[in-house]
Every structure is written in structure tokens, then in C-alpha cells.
Amino acid sequence: MDQPAGLQVDYIFRGVEHAVRVVVSGQVLELEVEDRMTADQWRGEFDANFIEDLTHKTGNFKQFSIFCNMLESALTQSSESVTLDLLTYTDLESLRSRKLGGRPGALAPRSAQLNSKRYLILIYSVEFDRIHYPLPLPYQGKPDPVVLQGIIRSLKEELGHLRGLNGGQDARETEIWHLREQVTRLTSEKRELEAQLGRSREEALAGRAARQEAESLRGLVRGLELELRQERGLGGRAAGRRSQDSRRLAKELEEVKASERNLRARLKTLNSELAMYRRGRRTLPPVAVREGRASSSRERSTSRGRAVTRSSSRESSRGARGRGRPAHPSPSPTGSRAPRFDPTAFVKAKEKKQREIRMKQQQQQRNRMGSGGSGDGPSVSWSQQTRPAAAVTGRGDAVNRSRNRSSSVDSFRSRCSSVSSCSELEDFSHSVSRSRRCRGRGKPPSPTPWSRSKTKSTTQERSDHQRHLASSGGWVPIKEYSSDFQGADMAEIDARLKALQEYMNRLDTRS
């Protein structure tokens, strides 16, 4: 293995700087240590046998070449497992005794040579052990001034010789020096230009990124402008639709308000009519039949003389029928006002009253027939006079009702009033015809062409009048107006009144 020719390093031992020089020539190791402060020198030469024998005594044998490498590593401090230390003889004895474990005894008197000797210790540290290799270095004293002066002179001569040899190269060296300075300057400029180029590249990249960002922002702005135009168009159309909807809703609101006012007015009218119906169900004092007939004749003359509204004619006809009826208890079980108007009960009570009136009229007719036949002429004439008047009155009431009718409820009530008034005339004429048949058994009248033609015309006129009233929504005789149809109509009236009341409650809640 090739060994270095020589090595010199500065090493600090125990806080003092020393210069250590190592020279390996073949199988000989030359070692020299010099104190930088005092210029004292210690020098020693060791062959390969001495080194190997020393390592063998320590118990960790090393070859000469390996030992030299370890010494070199310790000087250059390239390995942490080997270090150096410089000890005196006293330090070495104390270290040896501490290693052997004995007490430090009294030291024997030492010579000056031992005191001046130094020991260079190569310390090899392993995992669980430390091995010391001591190398003794005899004291060489201080350098000789004569020798030093000779060395100085030889160095000066060598320097002059080198300068003489290089005298012709001074200009070249100067030029090289200038070129080196120029290279140094250009190198610094190159570094500056590289730095500037790097900054320029960064700026260019930043500018490119800025341009890309600007382009993306422009595209985003264009997209937003397009969306804005679309939204404006949609907003305009939506605003138009909303304005149309608002106008339509305002119109519907006005219509609803108008219908609400109409319904409130109708509800008020129906409430008043209901109150009148409830008042009509109360018990009234008995009145003579003659007064009832007079009032009915006055009512017929009034209806023939002028046009009367539907409500007033209905009230007057109810008042006339109420005065002409005999006194009967009210159909109400308690006699007080009912909490709710029941049209079915009202119709049943009305039919019951009509049957009672019919029976009363038949009884009066029997009594009149039993007392004598003097009343036949007036009764027949009265019936002949009453029927056209009743027909005229029924027509006028039907026309007036058809003009003032606003709903199916009012139409049905007007038909019920017409049925009640006309059924009385029909019953009365029926009783008169029966009395005629009874008189015909004892003394049949002689038929005349005038009476025959008048009877045919009266019958035909009555049938035509009934068909006309039935088609125009007027009264229909009780025989033709069945109880099943009455019950269906009354159920329809109940349903419509209930729906109207619920609608008015919803309107009140909404408002």
C-alpha cells in the first residue's frame, strides 16, 4: 500500500498548539512534535518491528501499515475512533496505574531526561474498550540558530534562483495577472447577467400568467355580459308576465269583491227572508173566513191593478193565508225561534196546514149544501170569477219573478209561494165542482151551448195556463208537483244554503 511521503498538521494538545510532522520512509516512521509557543522539539524514529511489537503488547495487534493509516486518520481527524494525546512521563505513569487499578505510590526519583521526554499516545476506541499506543519522543531542545541561519540562506538562494529563472516571464505573468483579474470581473458580470436573466424570465412568466389571467377574465366578462343580456330579456318577459298576472289578479280581486258584495247582499236578503219564514211559523190568532176572502180579493185586485215586487206579493199572500187559516199550534216543539231554518219541516208543516184548510173548506161546503141551495149561483159565479183572476195574478207574479229571479233558491221559493197560493184556488174550485155534482144528482142543470163552450174553453185555458207556468218556472198544482220532487228540491236548497254559508265564512276569514 502506498504511504504518504510526509504530513504536517497543527494539533492542539491539552490547550497548547503543536505542529506534528509525520514522515514514512519504507519501514521507518519518523515523528516530530514542536511547541508553537516555546519552539521545543521532540523527535523519534520507529521501525516496523517496534510498532508491531508495541501493538502486540497492548493486546490488539496491528500491522505497521495499518498503524500508519490510523496515525494519519488521527492527525487529519477523519475518523472518530482514533485520537491523539501528548503526555509526560508522570502523566503516563498515572494513566498506567489507573489502568492497572493500583494506588498511585511514591514515584521514584526521575532523571532530567525522563522529565523532558514526551509520549505521543494513539488512542483507538472500540465499542466497549479503549486501547492506548504510546510512542516515546526524546527531547531535541530548541532549534540551533546557526542551523536556522543556514536554512534561511539556502531558502533565499533558492528564491533568487527561481526569480532569475522567471525574469523573462514577468511580462507574461503580469498579463496573466491582468487576464485573471479580467476573468474575475467577467465572472462577476456573468453572475449578475444570469441573475438579471433569471429575474427577466420570472417577469416574463409572470407577464404570461398575467396575460392568461387577463384573457380568462375577459372571457368571464363576456360570458357574464351574455348572461346579463339573457337575464335582462328573461327579466323583461317575466316582468311583463308579472304585470299581466297582477292586472289579471287585480281584475279577479275586483270581481271577487263584487261577488262578495253581491253575496253579502243576498245573504242579508236570505237572512231577512229566513226571519220572515220563522215569524210565519208562529201561532196567529183566528180570523174569519170572510175576512180572508176579502183580503185575498183585495190582493188579487191589487196585483191586477199594479205590478208588485216578488217579496211584497209573497209576504201579502202569506199574510192572507195566515189570516184565513184556523188557529193551529206551531210545528216547532218549543214554540221559540229555531236555531236553523229547515226547509223540509217548513214544507211538511205547510202541506199539513193546506190539508187542514182543505178539510175546513169541505166542511163549510157541506154545511152550506145542507142549509139550502141558495148559495149555488154565487159560489159558481165566484169560482168562475176567481179562477181568471187567480190565473192573471199567477201570470203577473210569474213574470215578475222571472224578471227578478237571481238564483235557483229564489226561483224555488217563488215556485213554492205560487204553488201554495194556487193550490188553495185549485182546492176551492175542486170543492165547487164536487158540490155541482152533488146538486146534479137531485136536479141536473140543463146544458146549454154557451155553458158547454165556456166549460171547454175554461178547461183548455186552465191546462194551457198550467203548461205555461210549468215551462216558465211558475206554480204547478199539487197533484202534478209530487212530494218526491219537493223533497229533492228541498235537499238541493239545503245543500246550496250550506255551501253559501261556508263560502261566506271563508270570505270573512280571508278578509
Curated annotation (Swiss-Prot):
Residues 449-458 have a biased composition (Polar residues). CDD domains: HD_CCDC61_N (cd22284). The modification Phosphothreonine is found at residue 283. GO terms for biological process: cell projection organization; centriole assembly; mitotic spindle assembly. Residues 1-143 are annotated as: Head domain. Residues 290-302 have a biased composition (Basic and acidic residues). GO terms for cellular component: centriolar satellite; centriolar subdistal appendage; centrosome; ciliary basal body; cytoplasm; microtubule organizing center. Residues 433-442 have a biased composition (Basic residues). Keywords: Acetylation, Cell projection, Cilium biogenesis/degradation, Coiled coil, Cytoplasm, Cytoskeleton, Phosphoprotein. The modification Phosphoserine is found at residues 330, 332, 371, 374, 446, 472. It is found in: Cytoplasm, Cytoskeleton, Microtubule organizing center, Centrosome; Cytoplasm, Cytoskeleton, Microtubule organizing center, Centrosome, Centriolar satellite; Cytoplasm, Cytoskeleton, Cilium basal body. Residues 360-369 have a biased composition (Low complexity). Residues 284-413, 429-476 are annotated as: Disordered. GO terms for molecular function: identical protein binding; microtubule binding. Residues 176-203, 246-273 form a coiled coil. The modification N-acetylmethionine is found at residue 1. Forms homodimers (via head domain). Interacts with CEP170. Interacts with PCM1 and CEP131. Binds tubulin. Microtubule-binding centrosomal protein required for centriole cohesion, independently of the centrosome-associated protein/CEP250 and rootletin/CROCC linker. In interphase, required for anchoring microtubule at the mother centriole subdistal appendages and for centrosome positioning. During mitosis, may be involved in spindle assembly and chromatin alignment by regulating the organization of spindle microtubules into a symmetrical structure. Plays a non-essential role in ciliogenesis. The N-terminal 3D structure (head domain) resembles that of NHEJ1/XLF, PAXX, SASS6 and XRCC4. Belongs to the CCDC61 family. The coiled-coil domains are involved in microtubule-binding. This is Centrosomal protein CCDC61. It comes from Mus musculus.
